[in-house]
Amino acid sequence: MESLKNNGEKIENFLNQLKNLQSNVDKDFKEFSNSPNTLNAEKDGEFLDKHDEELYNKQIIRSRLEDKISNLSSSMINDIGNDFQTGFQTILYNLPGVGPVFQMIFNIMGNGINLEKFYQEIITQVEQMIKKSLEDYYKNQCNTIFKNLGKACDQHKDLTQKWYDKNGIKSMNHLGKEIPQSTSSTIESDDTLTPMIHASYLDLKIKFNDAITSFTDAKYRGHVAPLLTYTSVMYVAFLRDILKYGKEMKFDDSVLNGSANTPGIKKMLNDFVNVTLSEFLISGREYTNVVNSLQEGYWITYPPPIYKVWVPPQQASWVSPPASELAHKFFLAHSDNYPQGGDLIYIKKDGVYELSPNKITHALEVYYSSGGGYGVNDYPSFRYGGKPIIPLLAPVGNAVFTMLNPNRYKRTFKIRIVHVIVREAKWNLDCYDNQVGEAGSFNQNFVFTSTNIVSDPICGNIGTVGITEIPGPFTTDKKYIRLTCIRKVNFPASKNEGYAVGSRILSVQLIDL
């Protein structure tokens, strides 16, 4: 922890910067809340645009400083933070693909749980394990921040629930059961509700930023990592719902999609997921280092309390794509390709993706396994934080992607591949019931050689990539759908055949038509 102590002055300067930014945002927020023009959508948009730019800059300042003080992680055990990542993934795996997820999250956290008591239980458990009391000032500060966050979440949940009820949008709890609609006798009009939701959005974003900044404070980050986990999950769910329903709630387009000066919720959500996964690695290692240095025993003797609070009583069998695709999942949540209800995708233990019978975009990110092969369900620790896949270098085998079509559901689909291809890539599609080449199997070869250069929504930090669509349409009722990227090693250099060193396959998507 010595490297963190040496940065005390930098941390203090950083917190002062945050304080100044915070006071400016608070001032703008008060002016906005007291303005007689809050019903004006254009006025809302201008203010929200300014607010999001300042808040995003605040997050960027913090993340840059965290990069400077996180070099101690290289000296610690590489996989020690996996329990925090697993907890974060488990929570988000069980989010329903439809309906407002913030309602579900806060129904677990807020309603029925005293947030102050919940916080005290976490701190007490930490202090018992490390046999040391945390400073009262810091404990009280965290308690106040967490309690204020809970109140703001409760207010936002109530306001948005009224809007959902008025617009006939059903909410589900963490077990997939429908939450009864509000019994309130007074349902405000959209003209009344939407400005209140806009103001609540601004207030809650500030509260989330305060909490996340506090829980990643370098001095105590290793002690309060569970609070960072809970807060981050609520924040992701909060942003996801505004992204999904924001247009209908009359949010300005710049808030959702960004503008020249504002990142927008899409980018904020994508960046936050990447930063958070990296942050959990740091927090988890420091947390473990603190516990193991001050008590007898090992990490396994102190499983994070996240498992006692968040995991649903019944294990969900249908889950979303891998955690590093969460941002992409949420982007699709408001598109025509996302299912209107029912199951999503089930990941079998052998790495096969079982496709839902509902219409959906099945996006499979490609991972490089630490075992030396390519697959779609490997989670090497270095993959988190937005790093791109290792280039496909010769000589390697063909890249194979197998998906299970449950109950031989007849489906028609097209294929989209996100990639960086040097030369060309030849693909083979075959659909079968038992063995490749069996009687009645459907085979089709196709080649793509050109790309449209755009920013990739999954791994946006790698620069530009190609997105190639093979329109098909492809139709099958077979049990297995398999895509094979054929790698030719010994082709003549003069022929433009086969992909060369420097190529990357980032994702393979089956899009039901």
Curated annotation (Swiss-Prot):
InterPro entries: Pest_crys_N_sf (IPR036716)
Domain of life according to the entry: Eukaryota
GO molecular function, one term: toxin activity
Inducing factors: Stimulation by changing levels of cAMP via the cell surface cAMP receptor.
Keywords assigned by UniProt, alphabetized: cAMP
Claim: Cytoplasm is one of the keywords in the record: no
Classification via PANTHER family: N-TERMINAL DELTA ENDOTOXIN DOMAIN-CONTAINING PROTEIN-RELATED
Entry's family note: To D.discoideum protein M3L.
Protein name according to UniProt: cAMP-regulated M3R protein
Organism of origin: Dictyostelium discoideum (Social amoeba)
Gene: prtB
